[in-house]
């Protein structure tokens, strides 16, 4: 019975014989050095999705749910949306890894200078700023944080400092209108939705 070697097998055998011949002569074969593989920690990005109308949140929501479904730890914080049983103690858990936070106010916020709202928004902000510093989540969605700044519930400098000092592993996605220009300048990616083009 006759067997033939494939071209790959023949090349391997030839290479093996060459190495043996070099060793018998007291020489070492020139083998290209394999560089060690260096794994680099992924760096989180700051993304902004903004529009002058409703709609910038829906695409981000689907991205957050998809990330959580794939095992990422995701937090969505909606700063101006209230509802029944909301607040830090009433956060909703979805997909195993997604937490949804809203302030403990009975309705959506649209007016500045309400002390109860200020406390409720600050409670959500404190949780978010802790996540930004610690890096214990993979993705943090800050919905309507620009409006919270515009209404005076979160100082712009506080938001800027938290974003500048955030853990490098956290992806931050800011959605909604009225994003301060200083925050826009920090962004790695800005998506602006427009009508009538």
Segments predicted by a language model, with ranges:
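Extreme N-terminal, non-catalytic leader segments
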Residues: 1-45
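Generic beta-sheet signal
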Residues: 45-49, 74, 138-142, 170-174
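Fold-independent oxyanion-binding glycine-rich loops
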Residues: 51-52, 79, 143-145, 176-177
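Conserved P-loop
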Residues: 42-132
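Phosphate-binding/switch loop-helix module in NTP-utilizing enzymes
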Residues: 110-165
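Short gly/ser/thr-rich secondary-structure transition/capping motifs
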Residues: 29-32, 121-126, 172-175
């Amino acid at each position: 019975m006759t067997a033939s070697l494939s071209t790959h097998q023949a090349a391997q055998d030839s290479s093996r014989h060459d190495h043996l011949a070099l060793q018998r002569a007291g020489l070492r074969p020139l083998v290209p050095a394999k560089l060690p593989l260096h794994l680099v920690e992924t760096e989180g990005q700051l993304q902004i999705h903004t529009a002058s109308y409703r709609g910038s949140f829906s695409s981000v929501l689907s991205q957050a749910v998809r990330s959580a479904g794939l095992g990422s730890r995701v937090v969505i914080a909606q700063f101006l949306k209230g509802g029944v049983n909301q607040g830090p103690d009433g956060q909703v858990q979805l997909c195993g890894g997604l937490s949804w936070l809203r302030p403990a106010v009975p309705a959506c916020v649209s007016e500045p200078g309400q002390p109860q709202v200020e406390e409720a928004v600050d409670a959500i902000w404190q949780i978010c700023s802790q996540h930004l510093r610690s890096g214990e989540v993979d993705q943090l969605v800050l919905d309507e944080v620009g409006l919270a700044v515009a209404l005076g519930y979160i100082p712009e400098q506080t938001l800027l400092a938290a974003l500048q000092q955030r853990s490098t592993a956290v992806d931050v996605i800011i959605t909604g209108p009225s994003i301060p220009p200083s925050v826009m300048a920090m962004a790695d990616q800005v998506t602006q939705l427009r009508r009538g083009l």
